Amino acid sequence: MVKPLVSYGSVMSGVGGEGVPSALAILASWGWTFDTPNHESGISPDTTPADSIRGAAVASPDQPLHGGPEREATAPSFSPTRADDGPPCTDGPYVTFDTLFMVSSIDELGRRQLTDTIRKDLRLSLAKFSIACTKTSSFSGNAPRHHRRGAFQRGTRAPRSNKSLQMFVLCKRTHAARVREQLRVVIQSRKPRKYYTRSSDGRLCPAVPVFVHEFVSSEPMRLHRDNVMLASGAE
């Protein structure tokens, strides 16, 4: 079972027939189970409750990554045997991880440049850690993507954009704080005018909302060494 521990932002939920389903909802439809924080009245949303309920997806949005206080994830309940400062546990040709970050953006008109930039930065800045980054995946609705030039007159509403991009980063729990901080740095340092997003009324805005969700696994996740960015000096 995978438990979401930190949610710096939310993933857009589908609205109507042309909406984009959230990545968490899609994972839930594949059989993934999540523990959703249950914030009772009088409890600060910045406090992670001890008890949680099981649900299919995040029920309410949190603050975006670039706003609001940061909440650190708690350590997992299991403690696999491994060296704290060395590479993740290995099982033959496989490398073991226990923490996963999901980085997603919605309505990005810069195609995959944003997540590609994040991946390149992590490869360089976290070279002394063994991590794994997936390629960018995309989810889209059934609405038509292309329209004739000038088909929408001034003042008319353009169709809602329907693209969601996400990538996943796997790391060792003891390195999660460094990965979390580096994600924050690279996302906040992006140039606003390089990426654009389309709002529901069809207008372009020089910003792309980026959301980061952190998960910890109750069981080890194994990847083949060929798919891992091994730490510098690791054999």
Curated annotation (Swiss-Prot):
GO terms for cellular component: host cell nucleus. It comes from the Viruses. It is found in: Host nucleus. The keyword Phosphoprotein applies. Residues 38-50 have a biased composition (Polar residues). Phosphorylated. Residues 38-89, 138-157 are annotated as: Disordered. Its main location: host cell. Keywords: Host nucleus, Phosphoprotein. It holds the Pfam family Herpes_UL3. The keyword Manganese does not apply. Belongs to the alphaherpesvirinae HHV-1 UL3 family. This is Nuclear phosphoprotein UL3. It comes from Human herpesvirus 1 (strain F) (HHV-1).
